[in-house]
Amino acid sequence: MFNIIKKIIENLFKTHQWCILIKKSNESVWVRLKQPKDVSRADPFIVYKDGKYYIFFEEFDIKKRHGYLCAGEYCQNCNEIKNIRVILNEKYHLSFPNVFLYKNEYYMIPESSENKTIDLYKFINFPYSIVKIKTLVNDIGAADNVLLFKDQKVYLFTSIYAHSRCLHSENLSIYQSNDLLNDDFVEVHNNPVLTDKEFVRNGGRFIEGESGFFRVSQDCKKRYGYKINFMKVNKITDTEYEEEVSKMIYPPKGYIAFHTYNIANDIEIADGKIVLKNLFVLIDNFIDLLKLIFKKIRIGFVNRQI
């Protein structure tokens, strides 16, 4: 009963919006990219190809409560994403479009935890056309999946929703494979390898620096996606994983959360959550909540009749 009441309150007062932020590495001020008022945009990944920057992100329709994946070209002069197209839309929620280069081809691993899969897609016409080529892991509620290519192995980092007391933000698990395309992924023996809410959940692609690899994570201890952490990987083997905090980035002024970070060349990209202080948003949420309740009642009635 408590969970039901909590869910109603969360939906009724969901007066926030995720926005995409961007800046050059030598600058300190994050700039918010233009976007419609009726959507949230989050989980941005950026790719530099043939002299252009492309941004991949989750777009969440606030009224329909549905997330799908989009791609577009970053226009530096006009402060927005141009030529936006939906590249993946399913009946289930999609987010965190992890786009990466592997053996001179571009691939994407989105979050599809609602579908209980970790799927691999390949770009057949970058950046707008993809095809699913493989399910990496089945029957798994996994969030924010990223890969580390090291020592001729592929490590898949994820956070698994195991049961009601083990949320995505409370664990970090690792799977490993000898080949992304031609081998299966298997769990390392000591999963979950970490269970600290402040550091475990992924927040972007791995970053390779002069001193090694850094895992981007988000702090979910204070609130979901509060800040960004850079975790230096000290050891990773078939049986061991060790990391330490290298750096933290807090939300810019005016934002209450900051939970994805990626970089391409000298362009850094992130997302920030703002609070919408608007009575009409609250009224719209109340109407949408009533519609959702009546829809569930109607579906339940039909199922009983069957």
Model-predicted regions and their roles:
Residues 1-306:
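Carbohydrate-active catalytic/glycan-binding domains of CAZyme proteins
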